[in-house]
């Protein structure tokens, strides 16, 4: 059976413009849908789609800018709405009503004109701001990260000496949880990316897929003392982790292995932060990298300094697929406990000192690097492939139509 899908993209580059883990997942989801039907795409992202894909048709592509930025009065009104109507999705996600009404009109005119079997988008926030909740009976929603868990982890990092901030954060977490359950209880299919953190009892686990992977089965440790971090720098948990690593951990590594260098591959709009990164000795902030495969190939060790956030790390799946030895925090390997073992597939750092010591150990232990590389790559091949992703999407949709 062939299906007709309408895919809405509002934020991330897709089909040829993959510049972060979210872009990769969006693109693979479109490809999975195109594998079982025809996909019409409405793209509101500021980056045009640059790659043709089989069974995909771009029916609308236009970036709608925030021509009227929010005023102080509007911001105050938005904040008040979160407390006056805590379980109303618009209270949490509406930013620019004028822009969102234009987006809603564009989608509505096309969704009603054509008999689409399903309307598809990623993230609850996009479903709300694009006015898609009205299509709940045919809405496929890739939630990806659990919104409730994300707010709880943000709550855990609030200073205990700021009780009002903590109380409002807790209030938001409770509101987001109720709102998430309400939305996912009505829409027809939802997916999430972390096996141990489902946002709703009906949500289906859908594995992340690496954007790049190793093309051979031979792994040789490169003893060049190059460390690599990959990730969208403007994503708050990434920015915090990178900052912490550069300030607290990297200098300790260079005391023992002085020629160690750190390459950071990831886009950012924060030129001041980008400049600060490059001002640190041994640190090379590269910005957006077109060919990530070369960066992975050139690195001796890949690290994931993630201390909070939700979902699962696409960069962890990429590093495993590329057969690279990995040192990560506990948060960086969330959701992989059933397929990965510490010290077998990766090394896990519990403290700053432990992080530095384990990186130094790998930089000076080629045999351990090779063992980790082989084991990690085998796990990625068996559990994190596109085939797994495609199969999960197809089964979920076919089950719905039985």
Which positions does each model-derived feature cover?
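Short hydrophobic beta-strand element within catalytic cores of glycosyltransferases
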Residues: 315-318, 325-330
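N-terminal subdomain of nucleotide-sugar transferases
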Residues: 1-62
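Conserved catalytic-core segment of nucleotide-activated headgroup transferases in glycan assembly
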Residues: 25-28, 205-277, 285-293, 297
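Acidic donor-binding loop of glycosyltransferase active sites
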Residues: 282, 297-311, 322-325
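Conserved acidic donor-binding segment of nucleotide-sugar-dependent glycosyltransferases
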Residues: 344-353, 361-367
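A charged, aromatic-enriched C-terminal amphipathic alpha-helix characteristic of glycosyltransferases
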Residues: 367-398
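Donor nucleotide-sugar binding/catalytic pocket of nucleotide-sugar-dependent glycosyltransferases
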Residues: 148, 168-217
